[in-house]
């Protein structure tokens, strides 16, 4: 820590608050450098945290955390917060097995008020926390930090609408890094922020409300005048004022002096407050400033050269999907690709560039994405919703009410299904088979490799009903891609014929299943379809084998193995059944290989489980 003389002294925000304001720019400089060095050595989210260094320092300097409660939305930007709150020396373990969590996590630190991972939850939770504090007369302050992407979600506006109606004391900070700081985010805005948050103005504002409450015409005139003063700098503020917030900003989110001055003033204000700050994602590191998307989440890399390592030569499943989408769009103008703000992650960059009229990024709005797709289907188009398994959970009612009940031809391309890895509990794709399987009209497919994935996407697209194809995070296995053809619905493939034991595989654990079967002389069936399931095959296997083993990367409860159990029960088979899958707890972070080994779903673990069962 010799390169970080001030930062090495900071083991908690209390230490930070002992520094003079004149020392804070140096702390920001050291914090940014330390963040870059640690993430480049461990992997993780980089660009967002680089952009929130000054804000993080200012918040912990002004607010008495953890007594005052600071809530980070999503948590990508919370790495500086972790460094300042006693976890500096553990940053090298972030996102690793048994290491510190990639997002704020309640079990990890008293400074992490809310466990997060999905976006747009901070204001709702913050309002609940603020109401609880107000009822207890605790005297603590509540601050929510939310990004310009997360605030587009309906949940954020629902919470602000409620907060405005309750007039609860809380502060929402919008970290706006969508554009670089323009000239109007300078002296005039900073001066106006000081004016509008100052005690003189706020006392006149609140006192004037009481005096003028019985004089509506004058009250309305004063309100309009105030709005025009604020709107002179930021017309967007009027929208938040209409929700019942006192809007301040935008101000420079990298000016530590102005941030502290504004926050000190706002801490004393009553009612819901909204501070709009402008930051630059990747601030202070030229490669990340130039490519904030590429440096959003990074593997280990050389931060001196700024070069990210090249990926595996085998394409990812996301790229397989993106290539399939382009191939289909070349011949079908009715295809519409939809993503809820995950263009890069879902492999849709090329599609969005080549077919912009057939591409929609609906922002962080999963519910809207699904019902928007339903509307397109009603209008005669063929929508494909590309969505991570963990985010599809957020649109469950829309899948049922707006797609399945009407039996509309919407294809769900479910990325990151199964064990995802380093992002931990909030991002594992553990539940989609279970929550989709119980929905009438839904077809569910589980490809075992990239060619199967393409064929299943094609099959689902050609069906005149809802369909889902789930595929994992990571690289495919390198099989040959064959021309697209429709698959027979609900039909499985015999991969290996053995005796006594039959492994019924659902998904990309097939190579592992084959290796286990070689040792046990077991039959292997690639089931392919969870729904409709191959009842005939299950019946035949049950008659000729002593033990059926189901294998899936989904929770055991309600999963594909449960579907097999239901078939066996309905046909009154007495064949033994061993269901292997994800257990009944939230799966923590680690590499995919580490997690599968811990869950006994690697080759050795599966073999041991079968032998123990016998």
Swiss-Prot record:
Reactions the enzyme catalyzes: D-glyceraldehyde 3-phosphate + pyruvate + H(+) = 1-deoxy-D-xylulose 5-phosphate + CO2
HAMAP family in the cross-refs: DXP_synth
Subunit description: Homodimer.
Pathway note: Metabolic intermediate biosynthesis; 1-deoxy-D-xylulose 5-phosphate biosynthesis; 1-deoxy-D-xylulose 5-phosphate from D-glyceraldehyde 3-phosphate and pyruvate: step 1/1
UniProt-listed Pfam families: DXP_synthase_N, Transket_pyr, Transketolase_C
NCBIfam families: dxs, PRK05444.2-2
A single GO molecular function term of this UniProt record: 1-deoxy-D-xylulose-5-phosphate synthase activity
InterPro entries xref list: Dxylulose-5-P_synthase, THDP-binding, Transketo_C/PFOR_II, Transketolase-like_Pyr-bd, Transketolase_BS, Transketolase_C, Transketolase_CS
Name under which the protein is recorded: 1-deoxy-D-xylulose-5-phosphate synthase
Cofactor(s) in the UniProt record: Mg(2+); thiamine diphosphate
Record-listed thiamine diphosphate binding positions: 76, 117-119, 149-150, 177, 285, 366
PROSITE patterns the UniProt entry points to: TRANSKETOLASE_1 (PS00801), TRANSKETOLASE_2 (PS00802)
Function, as annotated: Catalyzes the acyloin condensation reaction between C atoms 2 and 3 of pyruvate and glyceraldehyde 3-phosphate to yield 1-deoxy-D-xylulose-5-phosphate (DXP).
Positions that bind Mg(2+): 148, 177
GO annotation, cellular component aspect: cytosol
Principal EC category: transferase
Record note on cofactor: Binds 1 Mg(2+) ion per subunit.
E.C. code: 2.2.1.7
UniProt keyword annotations, A-Z: Isoprene biosynthesis, Magnesium, Metal-binding, Thiamine biosynthesis, Thiamine pyrophosphate, Transferase
Keyword Magnesium appears in the UniProt entry: yes
Gene (name only): dxs
GO BP annotations, alphabetical order: 1-deoxy-D-xylulose 5-phosphate biosynthetic process; isopentenyl diphosphate biosynthetic process, methylerythritol 4-phosphate pathway; terpenoid biosynthetic process; thiamine biosynthetic process
Family membership noted in the UniProt record: Belongs to the transketolase family. DXPS subfamily.
């Amino acid at each position: 820590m010799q390169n970080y003389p001030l930062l090495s002294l900071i083991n908690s925000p209390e230490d930070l608050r002992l520094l003079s304001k004149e020392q804070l720019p140096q702390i920001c400089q050291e914090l940014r450098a330390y963040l870059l060095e640690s993430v480049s050595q461990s992997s993780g989210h980089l660009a967002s945290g680089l952009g929130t260094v000054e804000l993080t320092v200012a918040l912990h300097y002004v607010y008495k955390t953890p007594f005052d409660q600071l809530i980070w939305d999503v948590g990508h930007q919370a790495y500086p917060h972790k460094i300042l709150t006693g976890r500096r020396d553990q940053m090298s373990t972030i996102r690793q097995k048994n290491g510190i969590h990639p997002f704020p996590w309640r079990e990890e630190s008293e400074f992490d008020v809310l466990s997060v991972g999905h976006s747009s939850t901070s204001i709702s939770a913050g309002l609940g926390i603020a109401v609880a504090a107000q009822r207890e007369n605790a005297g603590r302050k509540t601050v929510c930090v939310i990004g310009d992407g997360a605030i587009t979600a309906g949940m954020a506006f629902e919470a602000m609408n409620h907060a405005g109606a309750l007039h609860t004391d809380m502060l929402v900070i919008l970290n706006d890094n969508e554009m670089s700081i323009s000239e109007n985010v300078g002296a005039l805005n900073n001066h106006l922020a000081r004016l509008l948050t100052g005690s003189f103005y706020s006392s006149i504002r609140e006192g004037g409300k009481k005096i003028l409450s019985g004089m509506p015409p004058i009250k309305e005139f004063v309100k309009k005048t105030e709005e025009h003063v604020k709107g002179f700098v930021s017309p967007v503020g009027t929208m938040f004022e209409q929700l019942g917030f006192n809007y301040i900003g935008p101000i420079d989110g990298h000016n530590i002096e102005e941030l502290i001055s504004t926050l000190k003033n706002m801490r004393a204000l009553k009612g819901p407050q909204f501070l709009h700050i402008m930051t630059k994602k990747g601030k202070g590191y030229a490669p990340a400033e130039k490519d904030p998307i590429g440096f959003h989440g990074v593997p280990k890399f050389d931060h001196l050269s700024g070069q990210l390592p090249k990926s595996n030569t085998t394409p990812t499943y996301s790229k397989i999907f993106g290539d399939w989408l382009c191939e289909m769009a070349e011949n079908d103008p009715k295809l519409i690709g939809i993503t809820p703000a995950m263009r890069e992650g879902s492999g849709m960059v090329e599609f969005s560039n080549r077919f912009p009229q057939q591409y929609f990024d609906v922002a962080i709005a999963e519910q809207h994405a699904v019902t928007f797709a339903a509307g397109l289907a009603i209008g005669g188009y063929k929508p494909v919703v590309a969505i991570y398994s963990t985010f599809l959970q957020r649109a469950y009612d829309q899948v049922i009410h707006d797609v399945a009940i009407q039996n509309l031809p919407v294809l769900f391309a479910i990325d990151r299904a199964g064990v995802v890895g380093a992002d931990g509990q909030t991002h594992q794709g553990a539940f989609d088979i279970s929550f989709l399987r119980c929905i009438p009209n839904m077809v569910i497919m589980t490809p075992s490799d990239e060619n199967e994935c393409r064929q299943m996407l094609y099959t689902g697209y050609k069906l005149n009903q809802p369909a889902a194809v789930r595929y994992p995070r990571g690289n495919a296995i390198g099989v040959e891609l064959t021309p697209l053809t429709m698959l027979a619905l609900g039909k499985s493939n015999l991969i290996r014929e053995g005796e006594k034991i039959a492994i019924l595989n659902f998904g990309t654990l097939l190579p592992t299943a084959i290796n286990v079967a070689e040792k046990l002389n077991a039959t292997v069936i690639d089931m392919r379809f969870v729904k409709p399931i191959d009842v005939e095959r299950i019946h035949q296997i049950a008659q000729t084998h002593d033990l059926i083993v189901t294998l899936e990367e989904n929770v055991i409860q309600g999963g594909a193995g449960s579907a097999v159990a239901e078939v066996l029960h309905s046909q009154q088979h007495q064949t033994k059944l061993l269901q292997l899958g994800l257990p009944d707890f939230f799966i923590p972070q680690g590499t995919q290989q580490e997690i599968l080994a811990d869950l006994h779903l690697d080759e050795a673990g599966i073999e041991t489980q079968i032998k123990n069962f016998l």
